[in-house]
Amino acid sequence: HSDHLKAVFGDCEPSIVVTNRVSAAAVRRYFSAQRERPRIISLDALPDSLASSWTPVEGTAEDTAFLQYTSGSTRTPAGVELTNRAIITNVAQIFQALQLQMPARIVSWLPMHHDMGIILAVFVTILGLDFEVMTPRDFIQHPDRWVRRVTAGKQATYTAIPNFALELAARHAKDADFSHVDGIIIGSEP
C-alpha cells in the first residue's frame, strides 16, 4: 500500500490532500520531508457554514474531472485522466443499460479509490439518488449487513459488487427477500 501511494503522489504531485482528523497527523508526517508539501485538509474539521460560500467551478466537457490510478499490480500505477465528458457518458450508459426504475436507491460498500466505487458515487450524485454507503471493512466483517441494507427498502434498489464479495454474502447471509432489488452490477474480476 505504501509503495502504491508513493508512486501515485510522485506522479501527480498534489497541491492539496484531503483526509480526516484521525489521519491528518500521519499524512502531514508522510509529506514532511518533501520540499514542496501539499496543503492538508481535514474534511471533517471544516465548519458546515463553509458550504454557503461555495460557488460552482466553470468547466468544459473536456476538462479533467479527476485522475484514476491503475492498481499497480503489474507495473507502477499509472494515472488516467477522466474528463467530465467521459464520466457523464459512462453515467448515461449505466443509466440506459440498467433501465433504472425511479425513484431508485443505491447501496454500496465499494471504496471510493476503486473505479467502480468512485463512478457509482458520481452516478448517484448526478442523478440525485438515495445512496446508502457502508465501509468495506464493515462489509467484510459482516456481509449479512449489506444483504439487509440492499433488501431493506421498498423502492427499486441497485448495487455493485465484485464476484468474491457476492459469494461471501451468499455464504453468510440468511434468506432475504430480493424482490425490490432491480439490479446488481457484478464486476472487477475475471
Annotate each predicted stretch with a short phrase.
Residues 1-16, 39-43, 79-81, 130-138:
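Short beta-strand->loop structural element characteristic of the AMP-binding/adenylate-forming
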Residues 88-105, 113-157, 172:
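Conserved AMP-binding/adenylation subdomain of ANL enzymes
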Residues 10-12, 32-35, 175-180:
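Short, conserved loop/helix-junction motifs that constitute active-site signature segments
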Residues 73, 128, 188:
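Conserved G/P- and acidic residue-centered "switch" motifs that form tight phosphate/ATP-binding loops
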Residues 15-17, 39, 63, 78-79, ...:
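Beta-sheet entry/capping signal
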Residues 6, 10, 56, 143-151:
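Short hydrophobic/charged patches on amphipathic alpha-helices used for structural packing
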Residues 40-42, 48-69, 75-76, 90, ...:
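Conserved pre-ATP/AMP-binding loop-to-beta segment of ANL
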Residues 16-28, 46, 138, 156-190:
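Adenylate-forming
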